[in-house]
From Swiss-Prot:
<feature type="transmembrane region" description="Helical">
    <location>
        <begin position="291"/>
        <end position="311"/>
    </location>
</feature>
<feature type="topological domain" description="Cytoplasmic">
    <location>
        <begin position="312"/>
        <end position="377"/>
    </location>
</feature>
<feature type="topological domain" description="Cytoplasmic">
    <location>
        <begin position="181"/>
        <end position="195"/>
    </location>
</feature>
<feature type="transmembrane region" description="Helical">
    <location>
        <begin position="160"/>
        <end position="180"/>
    </location>
</feature>
<dbReference type="InterPro" id="IPR002657">
    <property type="entry name" value="BilAc:Na_symport/Acr3"/>
</dbReference>
<feature type="transmembrane region" description="Helical">
    <location>
        <begin position="98"/>
        <end position="118"/>
    </location>
</feature>
<protein>
    <recommendedName>
        <fullName>Sodium-dependent organic anion transporter</fullName>
    </recommendedName>
</protein>
<feature type="transmembrane region" description="Helical">
    <location>
        <begin position="227"/>
        <end position="247"/>
    </location>
</feature>
<dbReference type="Pfam" id="PF01758">
    <property type="entry name" value="SBF"/>
</dbReference>
<keyword id="KW-0325">Glycoprotein</keyword>
<keyword id="KW-0406">Ion transport</keyword>
<keyword id="KW-0812">Transmembrane</keyword>
<feature type="topological domain" description="Cytoplasmic">
    <location>
        <begin position="119"/>
        <end position="133"/>
    </location>
</feature>
<dbReference type="GO" id="GO:0043251">
    <property type="term" value="P:sodium-dependent organic anion transport"/>
</dbReference>
<feature type="glycosylation site" description="N-linked (GlcNAc...) asparagine">
    <location>
        <position position="4"/>
    </location>
</feature>
<dbReference type="GO" id="GO:0005886">
    <property type="term" value="C:plasma membrane"/>
</dbReference>
<feature type="topological domain" description="Cytoplasmic">
    <location>
        <begin position="248"/>
        <end position="266"/>
    </location>
</feature>
Length: 377
């Protein structure tokens, strides 16, 4: 597609033979590491997370796609609009504004699936949203970029990475399909695979984050504005996604899922599109943003998970104390009731085995209750 590029720093034509400057000499290593590790991570994660998907629930989301519709509205409605507002509000340079907008137009990433699992979200909805947003990106990415850049005076060919989108779909759907099959055939074993996959996925996320920071240290620039946007952008996505899901009367489980899906973007797709569309000279100014965004969305995700697990643990301890107190009271009351019941039965037995016809006093004594039988509700 065609977008416009402005100002005195007009974007020159792409040059595949141009050598990268020192600031981006990690280009080859970074691309190789992120491609290989991300592909392996995606395959392992989606297979293990696919073991948590039930065909019945997945089909219900497809038949009544209200949650998916809300998620797509957040993904291709709120995120591109937020990116546009941030680019305008911070008065970014043209190439930097394009980088922010491309990030906002990208589909959701698989990182949201592992975070959704850790916050007890709706895994069926999470995987459905990731798949549907990736498919929708084939048309929504060029449409959103065109709508938000038609008034900008930039002159640059933006290449939509359709091949990358296709690879993402393959790496997403095939492992999930195998995971769903394993969960259908061997439900007990799938629970073990799911737990192992969650741990391995967390470790791989940390490895990718550290590797990205270390390998791309030469590409970080000192533009505090881009770093600020990369910090607040995923937070805005999480908050607005949660509020929109809450406004549309989704369950708390779905609200957490949609929130994480909205703020987590496909970083690899954004980097690929920038590399295909811009020269090395402009990548120096642009590549730091998706890398910083990826780092901050990891940090935000871990903070959300930590906050949820802390809240969950405190709530569990609170209910545990209440239950233990009730158990003690119930045990005491049951012990007292048992003794009173035995005494009551002993009195009746004495009255029952007394020979001869019962007199008035005997009848009164036999019918007189000795204690009150209580129960704990």
């Amino acid at each position: 597609m065609r977008a416009n590029c402005s100002s005195s720093s007009a974007c020159p034509a792409n040059s595949s033979e141009e050598e990268l400057p020192v600031g981006l000499e990690v280009h080859g290593n970074l691309e190789l590491v992120f491609t290989v590790v991300s592909t392996v991570m995606m395959g392992l994660l989606m297979f293990s997370l696919g073991c948590s998907v039930e065909i019945r629930k997945l089909w219900s989301h497809i038949r009544r796609p209200w949650g998916i519709a809300v998620g797509l509205l957040c993904q291709f409605g709120l995120m591109p609009f937020t990116a546009y507002l941030l680019a305008i509000s911070f008065s970014l340079k043209p190439v930097q504004a394009i980088a922010v907008l491309i990030m906002g137009c990208c589909p959701g990433g698989t990182i949201s699936n592992i975070f959704t699992f850790w916050v007890d979200g709706d895994m069926d909805l999470s995987i459905s949203m990731t798949t549907c947003s990736t498919v929708a990106a084939l048309g929504m990415m060029p449409l959103c970029i065109y709508l938000y850049t038609w008034s900008w005076s930039l002159q640059q060919n933006l290449t939509i990475p359709y091949q990358n989108i296709g690879i993402t779909l393959v790496c997403l759907t095939i492992p999930v399909a195998f995971g769903v099959y394993v969960n259908y055939r061997w439900p007990k074993q799938s629970k073990i695979i799911l737990k192992i996959g969650a741990v391995v996925g967390g470790v791989l996320l940390l490895v990718v984050a550290v590797a990205g920071v270390v390998l791309a240290k030469g590409s970080w620039n000192s533009d505090i504005t881009l770093l600020t946007i990369s910090f607040i952008f995923p937070l805005i996505g999480h908050v607005t996604g949660f509020l929109l899901a809450l406004f549309t009367h989704q369950s708390w489980q779905r609200c957490r899922t949609i929130s994480l899906e909205t703020g987590a973007q496909n970083i690899q797709m954004c980097i690929t599109m920038l590399q295909l569309s811009f020269t090395a000279e402009h990548l120096v100014q642009m590549l730091s943003f998706p890398l910083a965004y990826g780092l901050f969305q990891l940090i935000d995700g871990f903070l959300i998970v930590a906050a949820y697990q802390t809240y969950k643990r405190r709530l569990k301890n609170k209910h545990g104390k209440k239950n233990s107190g009730c158990t003690e009271v119930c045990h005491t009351r049951k012990s007292t009731s048992s003794r009173e019941t035995n005494a009551f039965l002993e009195v009746n037995e004495e009255g029952a085995i007394t020979p001869g016809p019962p007199g008035p006093m005997d009848c009164h004594r036999a019918l007189e209750p000795v204690g009150h039988i209580t129960s704990c509700e």
